[in-house]
Design a protein with these regions (language model features):
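Structured loops at beta-to-helix junctions and adjacent beta-edge loops in soluble globular domains
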Residues: 23, 83, 128-131, 154, ...
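Extracellular structured ligand-interaction cores
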Residues: 15-17, 122-125, 136, 148-152, ...
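Signature of the catalytic double-stranded beta-helix
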Residues: 24, 61-124
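Glycine-rich, often proline-containing surface loops adjacent to acidic residues and nearby aromatics
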Residues: 11-19, 69-84, 163-166
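N-terminal auxiliary "cap/dimerization" subdomain that precedes the catalytic jelly-roll/cupin core
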Residues: 1-67
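Short, conserved beta-strand element in jelly-roll/cupin
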Residues: 128-132, 144-161, 219-225
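Catalytic core of Fe(II)/2-oxoglutarate
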Residues: 158-250
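Histidine-centered catalytic micro-motifs
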Residues: 137-143
């Protein structure tokens, strides 16, 4: 057991990424995708900082507003916090998996679960839709201070729900590592937070709309420094010469 622990920690620190197959059921992910889309149809796009009492909300981040973020992005994000009433019953099944990953990161398995923004670090679940053609996330490094690993769940599949593009990791020499072909709905990926990664546009020939549920969906689970913290720790973009990972509009 000790040798396995040393081996996996060394591997993750060394920049290896792991695709954990079937971590969530396919039905759970597809159902969550549909429920999130329906739930937010009647609610306006809003924005709230991670401050005490912040509600759950969803926000359309178009190409223009996405330039104001730590790294450039275009997406439709749905944010859920554990201190609210969990309207879609997502925290139970997510925490079942997240606790294992937190333990792997050297945290208590229930670290941050009871925290609210005044405590400094908070858990946040984000369901993300990248619309066709314009949806993307530029190459970047995630914040690593409070969560050592990327922890992403996949809610759609390339070749079925969308064509081309999607998630990529970056190897030395600015070489993109293509893993989308190996991803199935319900899988999760873990890698050290400072491994460069991003999301390339999908369905480049398709006209995007914010009302539809097409495109690429994924589930993000992250422990963030809240906006109650001054000089909060954030991720940062990286300028890499990789072709085909930005929208044509860029």
């Amino acid at each position: 057991a000790d040798s396995f622990v040393k081996e996996i920690v060394t591997s993750l620190y060394g920049g290896d990424a792991y695709l954990i197959k079937g971590a969530f059921s396919r039905d759970f992910m597809i159902n969550l995708r549909k429920r999130v889309h329906e739930y937010c149809k009647t609610k306006p796009s809003e924005f709230y900082k991670m401050l005490e009492g912040s509600p759950d909300f969803h926000r359309i981040i178009d190409l223009e507003s996405g330039k104001k973020y730590s790294f450039r992005v275009c997406k439709h994000s749905y944010y859920f916090y554990p201190w609210n009433d969990d309207p879609l019953d997502v925290f139970g099944p997510v925490y079942e998996r997240w606790r294992v990953i937190k333990f792997l990161m050297g945290l208590r398995s229930d670290e941050y679960e009871k925290n609210t923004p005044k405590d400094g670090v908070i858990d946040r679940i984000q369901v993300v839709r990248y619309p066709p053609r314009i949806g993307f996330l530029e190459p970047h490094s995630d914040p690593y201070l409070h969560q050592r690993l990327i922890f992403s769940g996949y809610m759609s599949k390339r070749g079925v729900d969308y064509q081309g593009g999607g998630f990529y990791l970056v190897a030395p020499g600015d070489n993109p590592v293509e893993i989308e072909e190996q991803i199935d709905i319900g899988d999760i990926c873990v890698a050290y937070a400072t491994v460069y990664h991003g999301v390339a546009p999908v369905d480049r020939q398709k006209e995007p709309t914010w009302e539809s549920d097409d495109g690429r969906w994924f589930l993000s689970m992250y422990s963030n420094a809240s906006d109650e913290v001054s000089n909060r720790h954030t991720g940062h973009p990286v300028k890499l010469s990789i072709k085909g990972v930005m929208p044509d509009e860029y």
